[in-house]
């Protein structure tokens, strides 16, 4: 618009020349006007460029500073699509008769009673093979160590692993002994002390010759308190998929007796 104003000023000057003498606008003045406008346009362009560069720099810095969390989720977990912090809703606290533990939030209570003294049973609503039970029975023992070693204790509560009902002659495939259709192997055991109370923690792999040679992991946590034997038994399939393992192991590891 400044250049246009300059040309209009030149035309007005020519019309007024016949009426009164006036200094004509020279080429130098017109050139200066154009140059001044060009300088202003260049200045405006530079400002716009500087602003764009600043915004780009800020956006780049923000992208570097923010750590984006992946949206992928394991089995049983909710995807954190927008990267917002969320509370841990994977487990629910449960308090029973003298005991407490964390139960996977998506597990359902079960009315099935497998063992004498069973007071609680929950199972995975996707695969019932993953489940946990709490068993409470009276005992004359003062502490869990009165049962002997963890392996000796396990031999006295063999009902937790199931009893072989078949008594005939057989030679099953899969590494079973003659006339045996089930086997149990202790994978690891420990005797942790939690809040001054002695516990036994035992992991057992059980296998049967009924097409389940792959086996199941049995996680057993036990202690004695107030004349009672408290046992938490959690089970999972040996060949499980991503994510299921943590629910069973964390639930078994959270078991404690008051």
Swiss-Prot record:
SUPFAM superfamilies: Mog1p/PsbP-like (SSF55724). GO terms for cellular component: chloroplast thylakoid membrane; extrinsic component of membrane; photosystem II oxygen evolving complex. Pfam families: PsbP (PF01789). Residues 1-73 form a transit peptide. The keyword Cytoplasm does not apply. Signal peptide: none annotated. Induction: By light. GO terms for biological process: photosynthesis. It is found in: Plastid, Chloroplast thylakoid membrane. Gene3D superfamilies: Mog1/PsbP, alpha/beta/alpha sandwich. One of its GO terms (molecular function) is calcium ion binding. Keywords: Chloroplast, Membrane, Photosynthesis, Photosystem II, Plastid, Thylakoid, Transit peptide. May be involved in the regulation of photosystem II. Belongs to the PsbP family. This is Oxygen-evolving enhancer protein 2, chloroplastic. It comes from Triticum aestivum.
């Amino acid at each position: 618009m400044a250049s246009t104003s300059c040309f209009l000023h030149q035309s007005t000057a020519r019309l007024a020349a016949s009426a009164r003498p006036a200094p004509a606008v020279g080429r130098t003045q017109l050139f200066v006007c154009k140059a001044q406008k060009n300088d202003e346009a260049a200045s405006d362009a530079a400002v716009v460029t500087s602003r764009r560069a600043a915004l780009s720099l800020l956006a780049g810095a923000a992208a570097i500073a923010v750590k984006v969390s992946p949206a992928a989720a394991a089995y049983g977990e909710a995807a954190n699509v927008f990267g917002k912090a969320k509370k841990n809703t994977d487990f629910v606290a449960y308090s029973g008769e003298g005991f407490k533990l964390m139960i996977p939030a998506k597990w359902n209570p079960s009315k099935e009673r497998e063992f004498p003294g069973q007071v609680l049973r929950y199972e995975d609503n996707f695969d019932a093979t993953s489940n946990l039970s709490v068993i409470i029975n009276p005992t004359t023992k003062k502490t869990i160590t009165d049962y002997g070693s963890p392996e000796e204790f396990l031999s006295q509560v063999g009902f937790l692993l199931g009893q072989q009902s078949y008594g005939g002659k057989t030679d099953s495939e899969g590494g079973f002994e003659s006339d045996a259709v089930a086997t149990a192997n202790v994978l690891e055991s420990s005797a942790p002390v939690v809040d001054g109370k002695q516990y036994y923690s035992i992991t057992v792999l059980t296998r049967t010759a009924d097409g389940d040679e792959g086996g199941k992991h049995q996680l057993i946590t036990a202690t004695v308190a107030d004349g009672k034997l408290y046992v938490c038994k959690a089970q999972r399939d040996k060949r499980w998929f991503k994510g299921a393992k943590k629910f069973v192991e964390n639930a078994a590891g959270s078991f404690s007796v008051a």
